[in-house]
Swiss-Prot record:
Plays a critical role in the incorporation of lipoproteins in the outer membrane after they are released by the LolA protein. Residues 1-24 form the signal peptide. It comes from the Bacteria. Keywords: Cell outer membrane, Chaperone, Lipoprotein, Membrane, Palmitate, Protein transport, Signal, Transport. It comes from Shewanella loihica (strain ATCC BAA-1088 / PV-4). A lipid is attached at residue 25 (N-palmitoyl cysteine). This is Outer-membrane lipoprotein LolB. The keyword Protein transport applies.
Length: 216
């Protein structure tokens, strides 16, 4: 399993069955978090994203819906067909990454390496949350900024070859400005991420215990 043909076949077969299985698709709602507004995206303690991801290599191309739930320690990514059937799920913690494809689960300590090993392509899941929220990392070289001083072109020097990141357009979501369209290129792979919805989240407080007086 080393190219996108595998996922294209999964997507096609899932689409054929989607009318029967869509009702059984799992909800992605993070029940322990509540929506909130922020002045800047970096203020969000957690967030959820819905959008579209397109992957292109010299051998193939693949387009999918993307759901991403991000906290300060964990990431949950789900790729689905246009009808909502899950193709692949990636769960990442500080110590382990788990990738589920159909009924098989694969694990590795490195999420990007796990994706590369199983699919032949990878997503920079460690740094992408920063780029999604319009920020840059310590390994990033800001090559160009726009008229508002926001990053426009960035080179990320993590790994053997750099990621070239283009912030093509911006939008306002949850009270904050963040990119609407990102393009990432490294060697012969190109990723395009379109952010349709981005919601800042805050942890829900534990409910107060019911007082004795209220029961009388």
């Amino acid at each position: 399993m080393n190219n996108l043909n595998y996922f294209t076949k999964i997507s096609a077969s899932c689409a054929a069955l989607a009318l029967m299985t869509l009702a059984g698709c799992a909800s992605h709602k993070p029940i322990d978090y509540a929506p909130t507004q922020v002045e800047s995206a970096n203020q969000a303690e957690a967030w959820e994203l819905q959008g579209k991801l397109a992957v292109r290599t010299p051998e193939d191309k693949f387009s999918t819906n993307l759901y991403w739930f991000h906290t300060q320690t964990n990431d949950d990514l789900t790729l689905t067909t246009m009808l909502g059937t899950t193709v692949m799920t990636l769960n990442k913690t500080p110590s382990q990454a788990s990738l589920q494809i159909e009924d098989k689960v694969y694990q590795d300590s490195d999420a990007e390496e796990l994706l590369r090993r199983l699919t032949g392509w990878s997503i920079p899941v460690d740094t992408l949350p920063l780029w999604i929220t319009g920020q840059v990392s310590a390994q990033d070289e800001v090559v160009a900024v726009d008229e508002q001083g926001r990053p426009k072109e960035v080179l990320n020097h993590t790994g053997s070859s750099p990621w070239h990141v283009s912030f093509n357009s911006w939008q306002e979501q949850s009270g904050a400005e963040l990119p609407r369209l990102l393009q990432l290129e490294r060697d012969d792979i190109r990723l395009k991420l379109q952010v349709s919805q981005w919601q800042a989240l805050t942890p829900k407080r534990a409910s107060q215990p019911e007082s004795t007086d209220d029961k009388q």
